[in-house]
Amino acid sequence: MSRPRRFSEVSGFVLAGGASRRMGFDKARLPLGSESMVGRQIRLLRAICRSVSIIGPPDRFPDAGIQVYEDEIAGKGPLGGIHTGLRRARTEFSLFLSCDMPLMDAGFLRYLCEQALVSRASATVPPPWAKGVYPLCAVLRRRVLSTVRSSLTLGQNQVGRFFKKVQRRTISKAEFARAGFSPRIFYNANTPEEYQKVRRQLEALHNRTRVGELGAFPVSSGERSGRT
């Protein structure tokens, strides 16, 4: 059997610079089985991207084994992390993934990259879910860097607002469903209760190969509000 494709045109970045206020401690380093939340995202991206880096404080990830970039513009949230990643990327396309979506499916990330390379859109994004909030998972081209920078300068730090400014390919909900994916992959673990729920499910089903086989999860507060 041939190995799944790795995209030489795509750099991968894990966004892990959040303050984790609702969790109460650093959620990126919370354990999920034999790996951490950030470690799981690194593993997914390594199977898909040419290179993988973390955007976050280097002192929080001394044993990451990959490059860790501090936010070049502090206090701007995920969009600030995207700015740093685009400036550091050595490829035309960059895949950004939040550290706090522990049910993410590598198959969907690969699908997102495929659609980005076919469409050549400035941004290729998942469908917006509850209250129109976009999951923090997207493929962006280097040419959007100027738009990111101007948004940050204007204090417009919301990722969803930025998406609406650029030419984008949005995966529709119908297309998402036809491709066999579940919205469960966008579940955010932002509180201790949400984390424990995910941890129990993953530990109970550690032999399953697809996250899509997991049971139902409610929409988390993070999906409703877009906060981290």
Where are these regions (language model features)?
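SAM-dependent methyltransferases
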Residues: 1-11, 118, 192-228
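Nucleotide and nucleotide-moiety/phosphate-recognizing core
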Residues: 3-156, 161-183, 199-206
